[in-house]
Swiss-Prot record:
InterPro entries reported for this sequence: Nucleotide-bd_a/b_plait_sf, Ribosomal_eS24, Ribosomal_eS24_CS, Ribosomal_uL23/eL15/eS24_sf
Keyword RNA-binding in annotation: no
Listed GO MF terms: structural constituent of ribosome
Organism encoding this protein: Halorubrum lacusprofundi (strain ATCC 49239 / DSM 5036 / JCM 8891 / ACAM 34)
Tagged with keyword Hydrolase: no
Protein name per UniProt: Small ribosomal subunit protein eS24
One example of a Gene Ontology biological process annotation: translation
Length: 102
């Protein structure tokens, strides 16, 4: 899977960068987690700092346009993002599980 950055917009108030990207794939639309990991590797960030919001594939095409938010730290993502988006991206689940056990 090949990921190309279309645009980047800094958002210093929320300690993040908003990114539009395009990915080319051979099979079906890739999962949110695999796109997140590929995007994190391309940007040299930890995968917990990347939140994929949107993936849009046109019928019959092997290109997906997406929107992601890349935070400065994983804590910034936990503070700003809504719970359902964190669950979709599998961020913070281990931290919450540890807190519930204590």
């Amino acid at each position: 899977m090949d990921v190309d950055i279309i645009s980047e917009e800094e958002n210093p108030m929320l300690h993040r960068t908003d990114i539009r990207f395009e990915t080319t794939h051979e099979e079906a639309t890739p999962s949110r987690l695999s796109v997140r990991d590929s995007l994190a590797a391309k940007l040299d960030k930890a995968s917990e700092e990347v939140v994929v919001h949107e993936l849009d594939t046109k019928f019959g095409m092997r290109k997906t346009i997406g929107y992601a938010k890349v935070y400065d730290t994983a804590e910034d993502a936990l503070d700003v993002e809504q719970e359902y988006m964190l669950e979709r991206n599998k961020i913070g689940g281990e931290v919450e599980a540890d807190a519930e056990e204590a």
